[in-house]
From Swiss-Prot:
Transmembrane segments: none annotated. The keyword Zinc-finger does not apply. The gene is myfA. This is Fimbrial protein MyfA. One of its GO terms (cellular component) is pilus.
């Protein structure tokens, strides 16, 4: 047997294996980076539903003196297509206690049949999309002439 041929074949095989292994490593090696830039973006996710509150004076006329009948003064529409359990209407400022107030400080109690009164605010457990309430002056109330204002905050709750 020729020793030169025997030694040459395994050596050639080893060289081929090393060379092909090196090629495989070169294919998986990280490329040389010539440019880079960090990236970032912001995406806003809007809250579900469409919360809306409309509060305005009713169109009927109120005449000063003792009222013969319940008389509408304000109308409130609260709506939200999102999931909720109910609503609070909290009188604020000079209207705390549930009154409309004139510039000279005259106070007249407001009432509504659509909401319940609890200590310092009106509320309703109603998860429907739209809730309306009319606030009125009670029959028998004495009302002086002037402009009256009601201030409050509407809260929507889920629990």
């Amino acid at each position: 047997m020729n020793m030169k041929k025997f030694v040459k074949k395994p050596l050639a095989i080893a060289v081929l294996m090393l060379a092909s292994g090196g090629m495989v490593n070169m294919v998986h090696a990280e490329p040389t980076v010539i440019n880079s830039k960090d990236i970032s973006a912001t995406k806003t996710v809007k809250e579900g539903g469409s919360f809306s509150v409309e509060f305005k004076a009713t169109e009927n006329e109120i005449v000063s003196g003792k009222l013969d009948a319940d008389t509408p003064a304000f109308h409130l529409v609260m709506s939200d297509s999102g999931e909720h359990k109910g609503w609070n209407v909290r009188p604020t400022g000079a209207s705390e206690g549930g009154q409309m107030v004139s510039a000279d400080g005259t106070r007249v109690d407001l009432h509504t049949n659509e909401l319940s009164w609890d200590n310092d605010h009106w509320w309703i457990d109603d998860g429907s999309e739209r809730v309306e309430a009319t606030f009125f002056l009670a029959a028998g109330d004495e009302v002086k002439a002037g402009e009256y204002q009601f201030t409050g905050r509407v809260e929507e709750y889920v629990e």
